[in-house]
């Protein structure tokens, strides 16, 4: 299994380096170079870097992909598609998915809404110092606790009903209420939580 780190253009205050492949998205490419990390892929329209910075990225990147600013995908979506083309079994961690432009952040939260990325949703994690976001397809799944993290929230795409079992606040047919996001739940004694979603996907 190939472990891929994608460095996007949001806040990059906390990251780890134990990866096989490093991908810079737009200005994230410059961040990798400035932190003396590999730049295996540089992907984006690069509208957030200067001409000199762009030339440096071109020179240092093993694979350089420059897209038109007028495109259907965000730079992060494009980078993920390129990664999964080359490494279809990769586990991808995205740093810098939050803290920048809010439209980019929202796009990152709903990455599985792209039909080309939906098959890979379980292979994508968004991470910063305080947050870990993962995606789950419809059906039943177990959510495992993360060290140092107590709280857990669930957001279901679409209108399907969600059930939650094993959390501090369970949700089933007896107490069901409809919300877009079920926030501020908690793990109990670091035990897994089982969630079931009839259709769509779960964030």
Where does each model-flagged region fall?
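General beta-strand structural signal in soluble alpha/beta enzymes
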Residues: 23-25, 65-66, 125-128
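N-terminal beta-strand-loop-alpha-helix module at the start
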Residues: 1-56
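Short gly/pro/ser/thr-enriched loop/turn and capping motifs at secondary-structure boundaries
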Residues: 29-31, 49-51, 73, 101, ...
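Short coil/turn segments at beta-strand junctions that form active-site/ligand-binding loops
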Residues: 1-2, 20, 88-91, 122
């Amino acid at each position: 299994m190939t472990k891929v780190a994608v460095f996007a253009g949001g806040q990059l205050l906390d990251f780890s380096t134990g990866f096989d492949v490093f991908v810079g998205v737009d200005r994230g490419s410059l961040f990798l170079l400035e932190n003396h990390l590999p730049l295996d892929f540089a992907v984006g329209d690069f509208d957030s870097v200067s001409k000199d910075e762009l030339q440096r990225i071109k020179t240092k990147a093993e694979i350089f992909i420059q897209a038109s600013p007028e495109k259907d995908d965000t730079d992060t979506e494009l980078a993920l598609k390129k990664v999964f083309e080359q490494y279809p079994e990769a586990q991808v961690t995205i740093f810098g998915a939050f803290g920048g432009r809010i439209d980019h952040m929202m796009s990152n939260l709903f990455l599985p809404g792209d039909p080309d990325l939906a098959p890979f949703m379980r292979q994508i994690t968004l991470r910063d110092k305080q947050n870990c976001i993962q995606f789950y397809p419809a059906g039943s799944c177990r959510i495992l606790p993360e060290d140092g993290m107590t709280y857990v929230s669930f957001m279901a795409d679409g209108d399907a009903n969600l059930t939650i079992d094993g959390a501090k606040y369970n949700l089933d047919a007896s107490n069901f209420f409809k919300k877009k996001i079920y926030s501020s739940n908690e793990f109990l004694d670091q035990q897994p939580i089982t969630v079931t979603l009839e259709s769509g996907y779960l964030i």
